[in-house]
């Protein structure tokens, strides 16, 4: 299967700042690929490079197995900056201008307005739109022509919970039709909800990339309590399959390196004379994994 996007060893420096540092990624057809990281991690610079808005200092990238060019650009829709349309024109008229720029006919305008939930407001002037509606109109403009790839840079930034939910619904709907979506975001919860794959960046360096499901399945977390907490704590710290242990309000959180069941834990404690009073399983969130990756990176920095 040919990758939709292949990035190989891309770097971009602004003076002494390493915006992107030797980055390599692969995005395959149909993936919802999240590029996750704090502000200044290189997300927007990476997207700007692959959209040919910024030139990399080194490295290469390909779209659809070929070097980038006019034909590949026609297959990509993107929203990189804040929505910017003519304020006194309606949503439909603004999209007609975008269609003219893209050399497309107007047949697709009603479809993208319906996808983004703006069809009933198609004859409303842009200046009266809320910020969330403006963001949705920007996505509608990117969807004109039904591109194979949709690129969104911080699509929910600055939105209220309702606006975030609207954008999430649009992303999931577009993805369900087979469109490959690449999203840059610092909102871990939203990435976890919509993305199938994720790459974690920090200060221009990739810390991780892979399936979101794999991230969430690593190191099962269990909450444990016992009638003898001292004995339980000793047991947890001597267990070779436990990665880390935290204690809060008399309850221990244990992260296991390998897959383990509650029955395994209960039996192990019982054999060693420990009676558990509390045992529950908690899946590791993307946020936990993200923070651990950043902590590991900081520990490695001289």
Q: Which residues make up each language-model segment?
A:
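ABC-family P-loop ATPase nucleotide-binding domain
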Residues: 1-11, 296-302
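ABC transporter nucleotide-binding domains
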Residues: 4-5, 12-183, 188-202, 208
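Short loop/helix-cap segments at secondary-structure boundaries that form the rim of catalytic
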Residues: 71, 216, 235-236
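Active-site phosphate/pyrophosphate- and oxyanion-stabilizing loops and adjacent acidic/basic residues
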Residues: 96, 213, 234
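Conserved NTP-handling cores and scaffolds of large molecular machines
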Residues: 102, 240, 297-298
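Short low-complexity, flexible loop/linker segments enriched in glycine and/or proline
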Residues: 199, 292-295
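Conserved beta-strand-loop-alpha-helix hinge in the C-terminal portion
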Residues: 205-227
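Short, charged/small-residue-rich alpha-helical element at the C-terminal edge
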Residues: 221-293
